[in-house]
Amino acid sequence: MRRQLRSRRAPAFPYGYRYRLDDQDEMNHNYLADEEEEAEEEAQVMMVPGLEEEEEEEEGKEEEEEREEEEGQGQSTGNAWWRKLQIVNEYLWDPEKRMSLARTGQSRSLILVIYFFFYASLAAVITLFIYMLFLAISPYMPTFTEQVKPPGVMIRPFAHSLNFNFNVSEPETWQRYVISLNGFLQGYNDSLQEEMNIDCPPGQYFIQDGDEDEDKKACQFKRSFLKNCSGLEDPTFGYSTGQPCILLKMNRIVGFRPEFGDPVKVSCKVQKGDENDIRSINYYPESASFDLRYYPYYGKLTHVNYTSPLVAMHFTDVVKNQEVPVQCQLKGKGIVNDVINDRFVGRIIFTLNIET
């Protein structure tokens, strides 16, 4: 701020005193010297820019900036998207720094090399563990068989929901069952069995010693063993006369042998209702059992030509024009056929509805 000069007056002398003239002259001389000194100081102060002028300049600059901002607001809306596009373009490719997506080619190459060695090491470790696992596991014989369930069963021909519903006088209703049985029994043709397999003595296990990777021989199960249900004598398997044939087989279990040398037998009856609804069933083979010569099974890698034995049920006298629930069970030592929550362990349930 500007300094203000203080005004000075000649000192007033008290009334009644008298001073000498030389003293008065000296005081006046000093007064004039002080006035000159203060005038010089004021001149020096006036030469320095004042604070008020600086403030005025700053206010002027602020007003100019505000005007520029107001003028730029109209253009900023139109240029906003253009600036964003420029930013995106520079992010995708910056020609000055030669960077794409904020990375140089060298950094990307380094990242690829790191990931390559990382995943290569990971794959090598996994491959090593899998290799060690396969060394410990035999491909020919299961390592753990304690939890293997007793054999389940399945039937042919295939029927939706296990309901055999057909009309004797309408071939189109039962022809699909005949086709299914013919296709299933192709592998049991006598000529094919005689060519691939050997004739084994019945009533005893066919145990084959040797290395576990050695090919095993299989016993013959000819289609002709099924007699009236073979499709050789009656190509319709009894469906044209209302006496259908249904084939049953046990699922394969590696190393399974019926206990105590007793063959597993098959027995069918009415599940619920009048037992007289099924008055006659013929079984083929006549023993209604799976002969011991077809056991044990050594697995698909070595027992290549193995043919599962079958038991055919020929329902020769069944009540007509109503549904008959049928249950067929396996019976033998060590066979389980009463599991409530599994309908196919040791038994199977299906329905016959033969219309005339």
From Swiss-Prot:
<keyword id="KW-0812">Transmembrane</keyword>
<dbReference type="GO" id="GO:0006355">
    <property type="term" value="P:regulation of DNA-templated transcription"/>
</dbReference>
<dbReference type="GO" id="GO:0006813">
    <property type="term" value="P:potassium ion transport"/>
</dbReference>
<feature type="transmembrane region" description="Helical; Signal-anchor for type II membrane protein">
    <location>
        <begin position="110"/>
        <end position="130"/>
    </location>
</feature>
<protein>
    <recommendedName>
        <fullName>Protein ATP1B4</fullName>
    </recommendedName>
</protein>
<dbReference type="GO" id="GO:0005635">
    <property type="term" value="C:nuclear envelope"/>
</dbReference>
<feature type="topological domain" description="Nuclear">
    <location>
        <begin position="1"/>
        <end position="109"/>
    </location>
</feature>
<keyword id="KW-0735">Signal-anchor</keyword>
<dbReference type="GO" id="GO:0000785">
    <property type="term" value="C:chromatin"/>
</dbReference>
<keyword id="KW-0805">Transcription regulation</keyword>
<keyword id="KW-0539">Nucleus</keyword>
<dbReference type="Pfam" id="PF00287">
    <property type="entry name" value="Na_K-ATPase"/>
</dbReference>
<keyword id="KW-0804">Transcription</keyword>
<dbReference type="GO" id="GO:0005634">
    <property type="term" value="C:nucleus"/>
</dbReference>
<feature type="compositionally biased region" description="Acidic residues">
    <location>
        <begin position="33"/>
        <end position="43"/>
    </location>
</feature>
<dbReference type="GO" id="GO:0006814">
    <property type="term" value="P:sodium ion transport"/>
</dbReference>
<feature type="compositionally biased region" description="Acidic residues">
    <location>
        <begin position="51"/>
        <end position="72"/>
    </location>
</feature>
<comment type="similarity">
    <text>Belongs to the X(+)/potassium ATPases subunit beta family.</text>
</comment>
<comment type="subunit">
    <text>Does not associate with known Na,K-ATPase alpha-subunits. Associates with a SMAD7-transcriptional complex. Interacts with SNW1 and TOR1AIP1.</text>
</comment>
<feature type="region of interest" description="Disordered">
    <location>
        <begin position="32"/>
        <end position="77"/>
    </location>
</feature>
<dbReference type="GO" id="GO:0005637">
    <property type="term" value="C:nuclear inner membrane"/>
</dbReference>
<dbReference type="GO" id="GO:0005890">
    <property type="term" value="C:sodium:potassium-exchanging ATPase complex"/>
</dbReference>
<dbReference type="InterPro" id="IPR038702">
    <property type="entry name" value="Na/K_ATPase_sub_beta_sf"/>
</dbReference>
<feature type="topological domain" description="Perinuclear space">
    <location>
        <begin position="131"/>
        <end position="356"/>
    </location>
</feature>
<dbReference type="InterPro" id="IPR000402">
    <property type="entry name" value="Na/K_ATPase_sub_beta"/>
</dbReference>
<keyword id="KW-0472">Membrane</keyword>
<comment type="function">
    <text>May act as a transcriptional coregulator during muscle development through its interaction with SNW1. Has lost its ancestral function as a Na,K-ATPase beta-subunit.</text>
</comment>
<keyword id="KW-1133">Transmembrane helix</keyword>
